Swiss-Prot record:
Protein name listed in UniProt: Small ribosomal subunit protein uS8
GO molecular function, one term: structural constituent of ribosome
Keywords: Ribonucleoprotein, Ribosomal protein, RNA-binding, rRNA-binding
GO biological process: translation
Family the UniProt entry places it in: Belongs to the universal ribosomal protein uS8 family.
Recorded name of the encoding gene: rpsH
This protein's GO CC annotations: ribonucleoprotein complex; ribosome
Length: 133
């Protein structure tokens, strides 16, 4: 079965794994998925990133983070914003602040995939891929 939207698939896999309190989840690898995972790690939402396999069967394994004695997921919610049927682009001033700055918007810019904070610092806009908080 082909996957038409790998970013939505990634967000769904992370959401499902964190709800079931799994320690990790695997996702089919691509450069975009790896870039998004690196932003999530930099922002403190996931613990680690490991690449497994080569070529067509390569996968990215993400270590999920939990907090507290009851293991509450660090990621409370993930929302896809720009979809294949409706792309959403914002300039620097139009980039949203997710939950008043507590969350992060992941933006695909001409200088790569980055958080909304980094895009604002560099003064560039781009395609808003998703919100994470």
């Amino acid at each position: 079965m082909s996957n038409h939207d790998p970013i939505s698939d990634m967000l769904t896999r992370i959401r499902n794994a964190s709800q079931k309190k799994h320690t990790s989840t695997s996702i089919p690898a691509s450069r975009m998925i790896l870039s998004i995972a690196k932003v999530l790690q930099k922002e403190g939402f996931i613990a680690d990133i490991n690449e497994e396999g080569e070529g067509y069967e390569s996968k990215i394994v993400l270590g999920l983070k939990y907090s507290g004695k009851n293991r509450f997921p660090t990621i409370r919610s993930m929302q896809r914003v720009s979809k294949p049927g409706l792309r959403v682009y914002k300039n620097t001033k139009g980039l949203p602040k997710v939950l008043g700055g507590l969350g992060v918007a992941i933006v695909s810019t001409s200088k790569g995939v980055m958080s909304d904070r980094d895009a604002r610092k560099q003064g560039i806009g781009g395609e808003v891929l998703c919100y994470v908080y």
